[in-house]
C-alpha cells in the first residue's frame, strides 16, 4: 500500500539529513497516516480510510460527504 492520504493525496517529502560535519544526504519525510472509520450520512455506512492527521482535523470541521 502506498504512503498516501486517500483524500488529500499527500505523499512523502524529500529532505536533507544533515550531520554534525554538515554533510547532507537525502532522506524521506513520510506523511503521518492513520487508519480511520468515518460515518457517511449519504451512504448510511462506515467508510474505512487511511488518511493524514491534517485530514482528520479537517473532517472534524466538515463532514465526509463534503469530499465524496
UniProtKB/Swiss-Prot annotation:
Lineage, uppermost ranks: Eukaryota, Rhodophyta, Bangiophyceae, Galdieriales, Galdieriaceae
Record flagged with keyword Cell cycle: no
Listed Pfam families: Ribosomal_L28 (PF00830)
Record-level GO cellular component terms: chloroplast; ribonucleoprotein complex; ribosome
Superkingdom assignment: Eukaryota
GO biological process annotation, one example: translation
Similarity-based family: Belongs to the bacterial ribosomal protein bL28 family.
Keyword terms of this UniProt record: Chloroplast, Plastid, Ribonucleoprotein, Ribosomal protein
PANTHER family to which the protein is assigned, alphabetical: 39S RIBOSOMAL PROTEIN L28, MITOCHONDRIAL, LARGE RIBOSOMAL SUBUNIT PROTEIN BL28M
Gene name as annotated: rpl28
The protein, known as: Large ribosomal subunit protein bL28c
GO molecular function: structural constituent of ribosome
The UniProt record lists the keyword Repeat: no
Main localization, broad class: plastid
Cellular compartments annotated: Plastid, Chloroplast
Signal sequence extent: none
Amino acid at each position: 500500500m502506498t504512503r498516501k492520504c486517500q483524500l488529500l493525496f499527500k505523499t512523502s517529502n524529500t529532505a536533507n539529513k544533515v550531520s554534525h560535519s554538515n554533510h547532507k544526504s537525502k532522506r524521506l519525510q513520510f506523511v503521518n497516516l492513520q487508519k480511520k472509520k468515518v460515518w457517511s450520512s449519504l451512504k448510511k455506512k462506515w467508510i474505512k480510510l487511511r488518511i493524514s492527521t491534517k485530514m482528520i482535523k479537517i473532517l472534524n470541521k466538515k463532514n465526509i460527504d463534503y469530499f465524496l
